[in-house]
């Protein structure tokens, strides 16, 4: 949930050398001086609220913003325990671990002097939407870092191979989040990721649902990044900022992470081989697709600044992600049915109406009354999309004792 779960910041504090005690005359500032110092700090930078100099207040959490995730770590330990799951096929995990250790992108995320210069040329409304894009992307990557890091720590004793893979994936996510946060500083802002860690709400998902959500997040992240990269290679005049030049190698991290979760689901076939799995697979696909579709159309100006058609871009990403997903999920939405995107476009229309009402200078109760019938129509459309005839899928033969790929 690439996109949505989470890429990284670490802090190291050196041990202080012993210092002899000394008597120092403490000077207590007057109340007036404290008041002056407090008001001297800017309350806004680039049109965004700041919590302190250069540090942006995180955007409000909504249904469409990136989330931080947590899970039942004890159940995770049981699912991957080699002692409890003696028949677990570790060959594919071991091969993946060796690939993660190669760290293909170790030297990829190196900035150059063009970043700051390019950021200074981006002005007006485009500048603000670039900052919003960087914040959402950084938050999503950092979310993944936090989850993967904790899984790596918790699984060390029960399954060292899988634990190390999670740790190495958290390494990737940390690089991505750090790179994006540094990009924000080109626009005179940054996120306090340590503050977010402690203060942001965490959404709980059972392990099975974590696997669904993170698989989709990583795969949709891959298709988003590679699609933007290829578009800008064909249209270099729209390359407003050098960040996008890194997307070709960057997206391979996302793809490898998604492939790891494919291996996880193959190792736990009970998660993808019954009627409940079919319903949950479709639910998570729709949740991810609808969230992206509404989010991106709400920020159409960003994609337009890159020369992209937001609708065409989103539909391409969803179709390609769905093709990848149907290889392992037992059922997926039929996104190539024209009715699917017709209803998605209706959701975009209704969401725009909600945003418009939200911006009105009216009392909250009045806004709630105005929003109610629109929300009702949105729920009805989502339900209609969910009950559309799905594509029965899953090209892997998932046997309880042996997993084999069907050609």
UniProtKB/Swiss-Prot annotation:
What upregulates this protein? By Copper and oxygen.
Intracellular or extracellular location(s): Plastid, Chloroplast
> Transmembrane ranges?
none
Q: Does the keyword Nucleus apply?
A: no
One GO biological process term: chlorophyll biosynthetic process
Q: Which domain of life is it from?
A: Eukaryota
Keyword set includes RNA-binding: no
Reaction(s) catalyzed by this protein?
A: Mg-protoporphyrin IX 13-monomethyl ester + 3 NADPH + 3 O2 + 2 H(+) = 3,8-divinyl protochlorophyllide a + 3 NADP(+) + 5 H2O
Q: What is its EC number?
A: 1.14.13.81
What's the cofactor? Fe cation
List the keywords (alphabetical).
Answer: Chlorophyll biosynthesis, Chloroplast, Iron, Metal-binding, NADP, Oxidoreductase, Photosynthesis, Plastid, Transit peptide
Q: Per its UniProt record, what Pfam families does this chain match?
A: Rubrerythrin
Where it mainly occurs, coarsely classed, is plastid
Q: Name one GO cellular component term.
A: chloroplast
Which pathway features in its UniProt record?
Porphyrin-containing compound metabolism; chlorophyll biosynthesis
Question: HAMAP family this protein is in?
Answer: AcsF
The Swiss-Prot or TrEMBL record describes its family as follows:
Belongs to the AcsF family.
Function, as annotated, reads:
Catalyzes the formation of the isocyclic ring in chlorophyll biosynthesis. Mediates the cyclase reaction, which results in the formation of divinylprotochlorophyllide (Pchlide) characteristic of all chlorophylls from magnesium-protoporphyrin IX 13-monomethyl ester (MgPMME).
**Protein name, UniProt field:** Magnesium-protoporphyrin IX monomethyl ester [oxidative] cyclase 2, chloroplastic
- Lineage, uppermost ranks: Eukaryota, Viridiplantae, Chlorophyta, core chlorophytes, Chlorophyceae
């Amino acid at each position: 949930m690439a996109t949505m779960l989470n890429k990284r910041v670490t802090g190291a504090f050196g041990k202080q050398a012993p210092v002899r005690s000394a008597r120092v005359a403490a000077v207590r500032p007057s109340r007036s001086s404290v008041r002056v110092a407090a008001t001297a700090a800017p309350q806004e930078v680039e049109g965004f609220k700041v919590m302190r100099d250069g540090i942006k207040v995180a955007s409000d959490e909504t249904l469409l913003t990136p989330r931080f995730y947590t899970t039942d770590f004890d159940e995770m330990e049981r699912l991957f325990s080699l002692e409890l799951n003696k028949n677990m096929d570790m060959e594919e995990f071991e091969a993946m671990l060796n690939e993660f250790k190669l760290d293909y992108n170790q030297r990829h995320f190196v900035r150059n002097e063009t970043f700051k210069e390019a950021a200074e040329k981006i002005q007006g409304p485009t500048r603000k939407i670039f900052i919003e894009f960087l914040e959402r992307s950084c938050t999503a990557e950092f979310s993944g870092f936090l989850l993967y890091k904790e899984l790596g720590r918790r699984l060390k004793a029960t399954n060292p191979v899988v634990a190390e893979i999670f740790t190495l994936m958290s390494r990737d996510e940390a690089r991505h989040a750090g790179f994006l946060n540094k990009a924000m500083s080109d626009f005179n802002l940054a996120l306090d990721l340590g503050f977010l860690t402690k203060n942001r709400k965490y959404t709980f998902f059972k392990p099975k649902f974590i696997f669904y959500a993170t698989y989709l997040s990583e795969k949709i992240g891959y298709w988003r990044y590679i699609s933007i990269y290829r578009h800008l290679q064909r249209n270099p005049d729209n390359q407003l900022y050098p960040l996008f030049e890194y997307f070709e190698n960057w997206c391979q991290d996302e793809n490898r992470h998604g492939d790891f979760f494919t291996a996880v689901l193959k190792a736990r076939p009970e998660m993808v081989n019954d009627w409940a799995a079919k319903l949950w697979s479709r639910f998570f696909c729709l949740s991810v697709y609808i969230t992206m579709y509404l989010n991106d159309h709400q920020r159409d100006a960003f994609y337009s600044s890159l020369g992209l058609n937001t609708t065409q871009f989103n539909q391409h990403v969803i179709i390609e992600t769905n093709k990848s997903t149907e290889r392992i999920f037992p059922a997926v939405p039929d996104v190539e049915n024209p009715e699917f995107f017709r209803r998605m476009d209706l959701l975009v229309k209704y969401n725009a109406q909600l945003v418009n009402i939200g911006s009105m200078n009216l009392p909250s109760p009045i806004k709630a009354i105005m929003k109610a019938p629109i929300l009702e129509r949105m729920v009805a459309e989502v339900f209609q999309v969910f009950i559309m005839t799905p594509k029965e899928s899953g090209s892997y033969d998932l046997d309880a004792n042996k997993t084999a790929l069907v050609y």
